[in-house]
Regions:
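Active-site glycine-rich loop that binds ribose-phosphate moieties when present
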Residues: 124-153
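Membrane helix-loop-helix hairpins that form the core translocation module of multi-pass transporters
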Residues: 115-123
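Active-site/binding-pocket entry motifs
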Residues: 123-124, 270
Length: 283
């Protein structure tokens, strides 16, 4: 199977052109190739597929083999892939995801995509649509939750996938390997949750660490950055335009109140192309 390793702010996936390649068991293949010791090594696998609703369709799989709904960094890399590898010559494209159809504007330099702006659509705060269960509340904004014996305040948002945003004094002091799984599997989240730990730098800047469901800590999460920026705005900690410092780089997030949509702008990088023998894995 031919593949391309790509990343957005260090959030790395193995990309497969499924307009040409066929994968019989994507869950098993994703788990195998994501292993950083025995596989290629990545946060998961993303398949670029045909779509009857958009220019292309994204099918994403986490490193544990589970299927994901949406990945902001991943969708930017798809945009770079399809342009750089000649699958399209358009600089505005649409990509179908399980979290909705996304529109992307491509910045091209010397024939290659360098930056991508994504319309991530409207953030969802209705608890039943995230889903998040919290008493009889219709929205969960800055509400206390006990995790591993400690009280945190959490804001729940969906960007096509569920997020719980928690503000902390210092992201460096979070024992994310210990607390991340406790949030991910908390009973208030029936479909598990991605958890963002946020440190406020100023009213235009935040630092973020993320524990992704099915993947653990990653260097970046685009939908998480969007959820975190919007949560910062809802909690009156920042304005509508926020620079998010992630472990793997920076993303610019802007909430357009008039359109009720979030725009994410960030880089997309190709690491290398390769081919892997999946005999015994995808038979």
């Amino acid at each position: 199977m031919k593949f391309t390793k790509m990343h957005g702010c260090g959030n790395d996936y193995v990309y497969v052109n499924c307009l040409e390649e066929k994968i019989n068991n994507p869950n098993k293949v994703a788990k195998f190739i994501s292993d950083r010791h025995f596989g290629i090594g990545s946060d998961g696998m993303i398949c670029i597929c045909p779509s009857d609703k958009a220019d292309f369709r994204m099918a994403m799989y986490n490193s544990d083999g589970s299927e994901g709904a949406m990945c902001g960094n991943g969708v930017r890399c798809i945009a770079k892939y399809v342009y750089d590898y000649g699958l399209t010559d358009k600089t505005t494209i649409t990509i179908e995801t399980k979290g909705g159809i996304k529109e992307l504007d491509l910045t091209v330099e010397d024939g290659k995509v360098t930056w991508v702006k994504v319309d991530m659509e409207a953030p969802i705060t209705k608890a039943s649509q995230i889903p998040a269960i919290y008493d009889d509340l219709d929205e969960v904004i800055h509400q206390p939750v006990i995790v591993d014996g400690k009280e945190y305040n959490i804001t729940c948002i969906s960007m096509g996938n569920p997020h719980g945003v928690v503000f902390v004094d210092s992201v460096a002091d979070i024992d994310i390997e210990k607390i991340g799984p406790k949030f991910e599997n908390h009973p208030m989240f029936p479909d598990r949750v991605n958890t963002e730990f946020i440190e406020l730098v100023d009213d235009k800047t935040i630092k973020m660490r993320v524990w992704e469901r099915g993947a653990g800590e990653t260097l970046a999460c685009g939908t998480g950055a969007c959820a975190s920026a919007y949560a910062s705005y809802l909690n009156k900690k920042t304005g509508k335009k926020v620079l998010v410092h992630l472990l793997g780089g920076d993303l610019q997030i802007e909430y357009d109140e008039e359109k009720d949509t979030i725009f994410m702008t960030g880089p997309a990088t190709t690491v290398f192309d390769g081919e892997i023998d999946l005999t015994g894995i995808d038979d």
